[in-house]
Amino acid sequence: ADMMAFAEVQPGDKVGELIPGAGFMTRVLSKSVGPTGHVYLFNGPPAAGRAPGFQPVLDDKTNYSNVSFIQTDFTTIAAPEPLALVWTSQNYHDMHNPGRNLDIAKANKAVFAALKPGGVYFVLDHQSAPGVDFDAALHRIDGAKVKAEVLAAGFEFAGESNVLRNPNDPKDKGVFDPS
């Protein structure tokens, strides 16, 4: 609820979610925008022979009829209407994975183009120690690097929240480490 309020998600909003994973935030976004809103999931093609983790949400038309999937290479975000919000949680660092060969600047510009004027690009990810370049093994990224990449696409920085920040996070261990 805190993150939805911070992102100013409203009933009726049309929103996008990049790399929705297993669909946890998809469910939250769907309920937040309500029956007059819509959630567009943007993801690459699924691995061969494997359904995407968010497939159960797409299949549940009783509870999530306002959710649809659009396959993308992330350098184009083909939403059928301007979006109030594009959300990505704990996956921005994945866009830097070497095997993805993604042009981050082009991807961020595609997000910018998909948003209506005043729209929000909401990036939530695990913070690395300052100055640490992207590290796939840790599943973390330097917030300053993210900010620089996003600003370069034409965005204005509107704020950040510490509500999920853990002051005891060592930042030099993988996010799945129990410490």
Annotate each predicted stretch with a short phrase:
Residues P11-G12, P35-G37, L115-Y121:
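Short glycine-dipeptide loop
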Residues Y64, I77-W87:
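A short acidic, Gly/Pro-enriched loop at the edge of an enzyme's catalytic core
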Residues N108, G118-Q127:
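Conserved beta-strand signature within the Rossmann-like core of class I S-adenosyl-L-methionine
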Residues Q10-G21:
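Conserved class I S-adenosyl-L-methionine
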Residues D133-E160:
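Conserved Class I S-adenosyl-L-methionine
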